[in-house]
Amino acid sequence: MFPRVVRLNSRLVSFALLGLQIANGAITYQHPDDLPSNVNYDFIVAGGGTAGLVVASRLSENSDWNILVIEAGPSNKDTPETRVPGLADSLPGSRTDWNYTTIPQDALGGRSLNYSRAKVLGGCSTHNGMVYTRGSEDDWNYWAEVTGDQALSWDSVLPIMKKAEKFSQDFSDQSVDGHIDPAVHGRDGLLSVVASYTNVSFNDLLLQTTKELSDEFPFKLDLNDGKPHELAWTQYTIDHNAERSSSATSYLETTGDNVHVLVNTHVTRIVSAGNGTNFRSVEFAVDSNSPKKVLQAKKELILSAGVIASPQVLMNSGIGGREELQAIGVDTLIDNPSVGKNLSDQAATLLMFDTTLPNTDYDVAAALTEWDKSRSGPMAHGARLNHLTWVRLPDDKLNGSDPSSGKDSPHIEFQFRQISHQLPPADVPNQVQLPDPDSIGVVLQFSVVNLYSISPGSVILNDNDPFANPMIDLNMFGDQKDIAILREGVRSARRMFSSPAFKDVINGTVYPPADVTSDEDLDAFLRTSAESYWHGVGTLSMSPQNASWGVVNPDFRVKGTSGLRVVDASVIPRAPAGHTQVPVYTFAEHASVLIAASYH
């Protein structure tokens, strides 16, 4: 992910948002000692992120069931800045972030990368860029094939996605004619989606490019129709009141009081009955200096701690590769070397072009005040620019091997960010020399993303301290094909901004410099500029029922156990052609049906 250009004064934010009213149907507890002693929970959800709150909400529809959610971070009610769409770029690295760092990456010259994961109720849906992309039809069919579960095919999940979605006219009543295909969307679900946009001249120039370079950059009416390999208007999880729509606001706040939420509390282990394979108990504590407590679910324990923390919890509980667990002094209860492996993410780089286009900068304090008073202005939008571009590379650029899920899937994404006088801050871990701000004018900045990295990473424990961060290895560019595809993405972007539409407003590329053109020079640039796009999945991958690999079965049960399921991004076998929040919502909706059906 990329530069945090918005720098905020926390006192300013708190003052501006004093009037923000937040409802919550569930009962929230701030400390383990506050939990009622007379409630026996049918289900315990370990992790109150995107998936965990979907599961809790759906299970709560049975009023006879009591559900407990345990979340390490604060409540979204205590972090009002997460409600404001325009503050999304300020959240990574903040109090709502785990602030992970990867181990040094060999192919990046030993650089370690920031790896943002949300630590707040609602998880990454409370913390992300709110982009709503479903992935490609090919992705879902691939997942169905690799897991042996046709319930994950595109035709099977599309009704689930529509049922969960509440697409609506946005807060400013902008016309969306020509921006979306209404037939693709649902309107009666819980998760709010809009196609809001800012009126900037850059919009018209991009659309003109889709006519001038239509072979490479055709226009797509709706990026969520299952075949996303064109330029399209972005859609966001924002509600009609210009507030972020997350699993905390859309799902949790609609539940009854049969859902209890314990925040600021870490899940340290899941506990088996008599060192067997029946896992229904969870151990938790506020911090490393606090006493640990254990609660047992009457029916099931659902682990939803995310792509990093879920494998960490399993390994600390004795579920993982025997040799790795023995090395850190953890007794092995279930020997499964797939735990923590298969980390699948997306590699990205930032591109900058010197331009005479009007800039998109604004006064943050004034914009916050406007949003607070009227839910309008730049803070009401998910981004300063309004389009995503998906590029499918021609076969002759793939060196005989196509890493995508199919012919209707793109290899590359362009996410346009801003046109600004501001450059990324100096504290971004980036070894490439940024241009001197005094030597250039306004700069168009956007990300170029390799959607399908084929070199898998891993999450491994340093020791058996559940409060210590694990070792995260993205293995970025571990395969030369990954850097080759991102290199072609950079060249594709340069072709876009060499089109006639941009001839009079683009003065040239400044990052990387214009003379960086050869394979060797572009690769050197990428090795010193690439970052993770923070779309990690796969560390507890789903696989067929009797497969010798993978961690969970298609019913989300952890292989070799009873009473324990995993529902979060970690079970998705591979990153999609797009952003990950919609697949996580969809997997969670599917899992909720399976869990509830087990008790009917």
From Swiss-Prot:
The active site is at residues 535, 579. GO terms for molecular function: flavin adenine dinucleotide binding; pyranose dehydrogenase (acceptor) activity. Glycans are attached at residues 99, 114, 199, 275, 342, 399, 507, 546. Keywords: Carbohydrate metabolism, FAD, Flavoprotein, Glycoprotein, Oxidoreductase, Secreted, Signal. The modification Tele-8alpha-FAD histidine is found at residue 127. Monomer. Catalyzes the single-oxidation or sequential double oxidation reaction of carbohydrates primarily at carbon-2 and/or carbon-3 with the concomitant reduction of the flavin. Accepts only a narrow range of electron acceptors such as substituted benzoquinones and complexed metal ions and reacts extremely slowly with O(2) as acceptor. This is Pyranose dehydrogenase. It comes from Agaricus xanthodermus. The lineage of its organism: Eukaryota, Fungi, Dikarya, Basidiomycota, Agaricomycotina. The gene is pdh1.
